[in-house]
Every structure is written in structure tokens, then in C-alpha cells.
Amino acid sequence: MKMTTSEIDGIRNFIALLNSKKDSMVVVEGKRDSAALKKLGFSGMICEFHSFKGLVKFADSMDSYKRLILLLDLDRKGRYLTSKIISQLEHRIRIDLSFKRKLAMIMRGKIRHIEDLSMYESPE
């Protein structure tokens, strides 16, 4: 897919801002989402939701983190999982949805899955 200069700059700034959140765990749905973020230069901690056997085990393993940045897909399943995670963890851990909103604004609906970001590699 072809990206505009503003989208490329937006993604670079997005990844830089995400990298600056050292005390946070970024939560994605699966391996391809994780790989896409790493391919774009993300170097922080990533947790793949689907590597856990259910929401309760996921929630129990997140207790040691101060903040979770949820970057689940922008589709129906991603919205459902986001609401379930929030209802399970909102009283125990700070949950940050601002990055999900920023990404949606940058991409203006062009992507619905985090893994699709890997198609947007830009030449340096």
C-alpha cells in the first residue's frame, strides 16, 4: 500500500512515542501484530494476548506492570477483547487506550489489524 508522507511521519512519531513508555507493557493480539511493531522499530515490551490460555490467566500475569498500552485490532474482535480486558483489569492496572486512538487517527481507517502495519514500511 502507498503511504503519504504525513502517514510515514505519523507512524515514525507514533513508534518513537511508544518506545518512550519504558514502564509500560504493550498488549497486542498475536505474533504477527508483535512482529509488525518490531519491524517498524518498536523496542519495548510486548505481550501477545493469544499466547495466554484465557482472560483470567492473562490478567493475573499483568499484575506486575504499572501500565498496559492496549493495541488490539480495530475490528469487532479487537473491540470485544479490549472491553473484556478493561473490565477485568481497570481497578488493578492503569490501562492506556490513547495509542490505539492515535494510530486510528494517523491511518484514517486504512488498517483494521495491527499486523497490517508491516505493509507500510517506508524507505529511510
Regions found by a protein language model. Give the residues of each.
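Phosphate-handling DNA/RNA-contact segment within nucleic-acid enzymes
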Residues: M1-M25, K31-A35, F58-A59
